Structures are given as structure tokens and as C-alpha cells.
């Protein structure tokens, strides 16, 4: 179909994963904010 998302949203831990995937936070920040 050729569809490409403009962005990704998340909820709860999904927000952390989204921020990491989009390059907004580092891996260390993602791990620390999840715990």
C-alpha cells in the first residue's frame, strides 16, 4: 500500500519506547525512566 507513518505515539511504557525510537532520548535515559 505504500503507507508510511508521520510519527509514533505511545501510552505508558510505550511513550518511553516511542521517545527512544524517535531519537528523543538515549538508551540510558529510556532505561532509567522505565524504572
Swiss-Prot record:
Q: Which cysteines are joined by disulfide bonds?
A: none
* Keyword Transport annotated: no
Q: According to the UniProt record, what class of enzyme is this?
A: transferase
Query: What catalytic reaction does the record list?
Result: acetyl-CoA + n malonyl-CoA + 2n NADPH + 2n H(+) = a long-chain fatty acid + (n+1) CoA + n CO2 + 2n NADP(+)
* GO BP terms: fatty acid biosynthetic process
Which Pfam families does this entry report, sorted A to Z? Acyl_transf_1
> Where does this protein reside within or beyond the cell?
Cytoplasm; Melanosome
The answer to whether UniProt assigns keyword Lipid metabolism to this entry is yes
Q: Which InterPro entries match?
A: Ac_transferase_dom_sf, Acyl_transferase_dom, Acyl_Trfase/lysoPLipase
Q: Name one GO molecular function term.
A: fatty acid synthase activity
Entry EC no(s): 2.3.1.85
Q: What is its main location?
A: cytoplasm
Assembly and partners?
A: Homodimer which is arranged in a head to tail fashion. Interacts with CEACAM1; this interaction is insulin and phosphorylation-dependent; reduces fatty-acid synthase activity.
What this chain does, per the entry, is described as:
Fatty acid synthetase catalyzes the formation of long-chain fatty acids from acetyl-CoA, malonyl-CoA and NADPH. This multifunctional protein has 7 catalytic activities as an acyl carrier protein. This fragment is from the acyltransferase domain of the fatty acid synthetase.
- Protein name from the UniProt record: Fatty acid synthase
Q: What is the lineage of its organism?
A: Eukaryota, Metazoa, Chordata, Craniata, Vertebrata
Q: What is this protein's gene name?
A: FASN
Amino acid at each position: 500500500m505504500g503507507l508510511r507513518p508521520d510519527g509514533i505515539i505511545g501510552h505508558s511504557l510505550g511513550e518511553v519506547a516511542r521517545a527512544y525510537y524517535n531519537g528523543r532520548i538515549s538508551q540510558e535515559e529510556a532505561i532509567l525512566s522505565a524504572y
